[in-house]
Amino acid sequence: MKKSLPLLNDQQMKSFIQDGYIKLAPDYPPELHEKIYREIEQMLSKNGNLGNNILPLIPDIQTIFDHPLVRGALTGVLGVNYVMHSHRFCHFNVPGSVGQDFHKDSYEGDISANNHRCRWAMAFYYPQNTPKEIGPTAILPGSQYYETSQAAHQHNELVLSGEPGTITIIHYDLWHRAMANLSLSNRYMLKFLFYRLQEPTVPTWQNEDTKWHPTTHEKIYNSDQQIMYRSLWSWNLGDSSPQSTIDTRYDTSELVKKLSADSEEERLRSAYTLGAIGDKVIPELIDLLESKSIGAYATLALGSSNPTVVPKLISALKHSSDLVRARIASALGDLGDYSALEHLLLALGDTAPRVRRNATESLGNISLKHGNQSLIEKQATNLGKILLDEHYWIRDNAARSLAKMGAQAEPAVVPLTCALSDENRYVRFNAALALKRIGTPKAQDILFDHLFTSRWCPMTTSDSPY
């Protein structure tokens, strides 16, 4: 961990787990934000919105995200080895706009795969003063764990107004929207994505108390999910058996019934309570995985349990239903026990795309500290083969999982080199990242040759072609 960074404290981290956001004010001079604002206006007037290429066009934006305050906050919520994703966008809110409805963003390069555990985050940056009337972003704090609009709207709207340079980091699945612009000025908000490269093993914030205590600040949301919050807090601490303090005297049959309750809040609370209870409810939870309505909550329960349940889940990877196999593969990734590795490697050959996708992602979430070099080489080799899958969202997960393996992904250098020419831009990005993290002279040469060939020069325009 970079000790020089101003890290989040326990209270800030707990607030992020509950609320799903943290607001920052890096101390850059106003002139920097004014310069970025002018260059955004110039981009839009001359070239339109260049989307992902806004960063090489306006490299000062990188300076904003390199601020120690921002890096410290991202380190807290995403771990030391977080990475900036290659998707970014300038959201342009024009005068007179009516705003948006609340929504969750899709995952770039992947199918929708919401995570309660913070593996992805977004950052919103304002280069201009952004009062309410200019149409800032609004969020529903605490809504990141809810899938239905009805449940999300039980939470109160918070307007993210702010001075030039304001940055808000949010959990990727937080419900948010652009508000109506009632002013005569343009409002720009730059959205950048980040994701973690390593599951937590130790706290990456300034941790002093490992016990979960509800935050003391005034609640601005209307739900209370202390068992879920404690589970997520324990995961961020790197605790592999986070539920040792749960009261096991719950009526499990009643909890199972509540997985189909009308209230999403009740379904969620029951799922995490069942996960905390663990072993004795696992067979019943596995039986529920085939249900489209209840299965997602059973998956949450299984994934938030403890490694002692892994053998039962491994057996269920042979279930006749591909939906069950996919959900089991996902839960095994959340549990993170390396005894599941060989079985997840076999699941890469499943005929069902969603099983292959979940197995591919889960392989990137399981620690390599087991030290079985033969198994690590097999993992890298098989993930390299999946880079040829017909579905881009499986290839994207394969490249990202190889990037998470770091130097251990060296056996996949050849397929990663081919993936630099993939038809999907995000597969290309993750393949390049994987080569960077492999770090051998061969991987570095391949990467630099690719980057020099594909380099986009921000100084070259139709007015100045050479």
Regions found by a protein language model. Give the residues of each.
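Amphipathic alpha-helical scaffolding segments comprising HEAT/armadillo-like alpha-solenoid repeats
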Residues: D247-S260, I277-E290, P307-K318, D337-G349, ...
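Alpha-solenoid HEAT/ARM repeat scaffold
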Residues: L268, Y272, P283, G295-L300, ...
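Non-heme Fe(II)-dependent double-stranded beta-helix
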Residues: M1-A113
